[in-house]
Amino acid sequence: MDISLERKFLSSFREIGSEKKVCNISSDIIVPDTKADILRVVLTNGEYSIRSKDVESGKVLICGELKVNVVYVPESGTPLSTLCTDIPFECEFEVESADSGCAAIAEIDVISVDTRILNPRKIMINAQVAVSQKCFCNADFSWYSSPGNAPKNAFFKKSSAEARLISAVDEKTFSLEDNFAMQCVDEETQLISTPVLFCTDSADIVGSKLIVKG
């Protein structure tokens, strides 16, 4: 009598590569005709956004954009004036076993953003961003169990082990909107910069949903 063990599967992911790189970004900004000449730069602020994450054969390509705001004192002295530009960048990682069926997650940190005045009508932006990526591929987890129709006099040696599996690699884009009351604001007030910081307080799984609070 032939007895075959029953093989069971559970879909999961496994990490096949992770790496961190520092990307150098540079771009020039020409002062528009509607703006005054630059006397002195007082503030440079940079915020990033991830545009795409592409996984191809043997590599992961992360594309993003750095939004730079520059606040400067014009040659006339007052009032303060601003310049802004969007600088695209990309960072490529070699992941030997990656293919188009894999998924990648990325994190970006702005290390530094500096402004150099080339002349009163032109500045150079030099920035460094740290790009981190992790690449995951599908990996079915399997185990064997005794068949339901096994004879009563058949005995099976069993063992157990704890396994922690990655069950999902996904992302979601959402928008936020809120009002901020400001005092001592008049018609001549200028909005100079709007840095934003996101903080996560908790992440809980409820049924098939991941609830993130922050």
PLM regions with names:
Residues M1-G214:
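Viral structural modules
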